[in-house]
UniProtKB/Swiss-Prot annotation:
The lineage of its organism: Bacteria, Pseudomonadati, Pseudomonadota, Gammaproteobacteria, Enterobacterales. It comes from Yersinia pestis. Its EC number is 1.11.1.21. This is Catalase-peroxidase. Keywords: Heme, Hydrogen peroxide, Iron, Metal-binding, Oxidoreductase, Periplasm, Peroxidase, Signal. Bifunctional enzyme with both catalase and broad-spectrum peroxidase activity.
Amino acid sequence: MLKKILPVLITLAIVHNTPTAWAAEAPKTDSFYLPKSLDLSPLRLHNIESNPYGKDFNYAQQFKTLDLEAVKKDIKTVLTTSQDWWPADYGNYGPFFIRMAWHGAGTYRIYDGRGGADGGQQRFEPLNSWPDNANLDKARRLLWPIKKKYGAKISWGDLMVLTGNVALESMGFKTLGFAGGREDDWQSDLVYWGAGNKMLSDNRDKNGKLPKPLAATQMGLIYVNPEGPNGKPDPVAAAKDIREAFARMAMNDEETVALIAGGHTFGKAHGAASPEKCLGAAPGEAGLEQQGLGWANKCGSGNGKDTITSGLEGAWTTDPTHFTMQYLSNLYKHEWVLTKSPAGAWQWKPKNAANVVPDATDPTKFHPLMMFTTDIALKVDPEYKKITTRFLENPEEFKMAFARAWFKLTHRDMGPAARYLGDEVPKETFIWQDPLPAANYKMIDSADISELKDKILKTGLSDTKLIKTAWASASTFRGTDFRGGDNGARIRLAPQKDWPVNDPAELHSVLAALMEVQNNFNKDRSDGKKVSLSDLIVLGGNAAIEDAAKKAGYSISIPFTPGRTDASQEETDVSSFAVLEPTADGFRNYYDAKRNTLSPIASLIDRANKLELTVPEMTVLIGGLRVLDVNSGGSKAGVLTNTPGQLNNNFFVNLLDMSTKWTKSPKAEGYFDGYDRKTGKLKWTASSVDLVFGSNPELRAVAEVYASDDAKEKFVHDFTKVWEKVMNLDRFDIKNN
């Protein structure tokens, strides 16, 4: 009897444990039950425990032990060793790897610094399943033996970019160089890629505009639709999309043309048949047996001559595995007419097209040339036409433009050159790297530091002003692309000196006083020592916080390492730095409603995320900055203390005090008034950013720790530790050594 029942029970168990059942029973996040709940998950990305190498792992030190030439030699071997499970077009994976590197780096966008090659995010969802990244899962699998061989010494982010470089070099193109230093992420980044979740849906709003911070015009694309906007083969409209998308990825017209023309010199597009009819699920939705691969092709052999990627089909040149000028010459040599690929995608072919392109798998077969709608756009658009014709007439200029644009594409999200590692780093510096001058003087020592702190405090500047200035300077840092920060003292330069959040008039007076201290220290010295303004700004903030702690009864000393230098206005691209302007800074209770799409609270989480803060770090930082009275514009919102300027835990104590009743302020949206429950007397004012630390249960849990009677000293030390962290976020000169 048991033998008869057992198969039935097994069958029932299998039926019960279907993916649908698993999905129904899986744990849910708060937002599933409470859609309006605050999402703090971005701040949990900064918990080091997710890194399997551990908290003491230093990637820069590992990379410095790497034999880069040996890695490049191994990559060259992979390039021309075709694998049966995914054969190489023309016997060379070079073009395939260029696409992999390009698409890894090409997600970068200027407005929030997210995307890019750093972190190796192409390995994770959703990027690994974007239609524009179709089949790049195979490219990374081809590289696995190399990654396996060198392990911790080279990250996926570095390996993918290096492979793209080696591919270009092996096919006859001279690159500008390569810099390592991209540390791998260990989970998907949390990024807003667009309002919808349907692949290839239009990212534009109802007015036809692409909202910030987006750069790609359609969901799941790196840049633009190669068939034309939303699949319509209109070269003029495509040019408009190209210009906007590439500009939002930090590229001007010349760099854009160089990248497209240079990249499309190599390889081919794959559209042997319809993707909808032939391809299986993307990696993120494929079965376990696929082991992270996706787009299984059920048509024909499934690869080689039957490969399907974009649905477009063909090559731009007759020699797809060598660098030539054919892309540009073919663009102008032929009259291009609209046609469709075997998969039904819009593309272009020469009028009276001849079969001149060798087949990728059968050397006895030939095909016509082809172009995308986005290629024809470079000939139709007046400005792009000027550049393409100039490049066609000046091949050496084109080569250099492509080399520079490729280097920028693959390194733009790495931040300053101080993060660059390896022997192939170009000696030339570029304005987009936010260059810093080298220090040509001796650094100050501990005695000098004590002397300077004393002199700063004797300038007559209040602790509040010194702390505000240090925060304004250092908090521009964003860990998304490692830009900003105090190093360079660009807060004294355009555009930062005029940002409303920085209270420009007050800032000017503080900087003037600090520069006087700097000049007095530096002049007529015989020991070769100097101090930079950027060091003084941080030192002034540290001295002021130590003084504020002393006033509250605590003796602290904030560690300080000199070495920052001061950039010039000529080393500062005003338009490039403009995107770093905080239109919301919850740490200073500042919010410009006209220039924000996120709420004040969501903006705080976003800024804390860019500052690489955890939930406790953000919480203690808010509490400390509030009692130190550093709000922008002198606002008293959230200054929940009767002793402003003293570093203590009063913000949390008073926020959680049940003797206060909070009501919405009639004076301004997003602000609240706190009244004494017994007397009805107004005690405090606060913003939504302040009250969320008592309203949200997770934030309140942390706030309760710091409001406790036994946490007064803990609060002071935790605050100063986080302060030190923020002041040093841009000190890559220290981190890499």
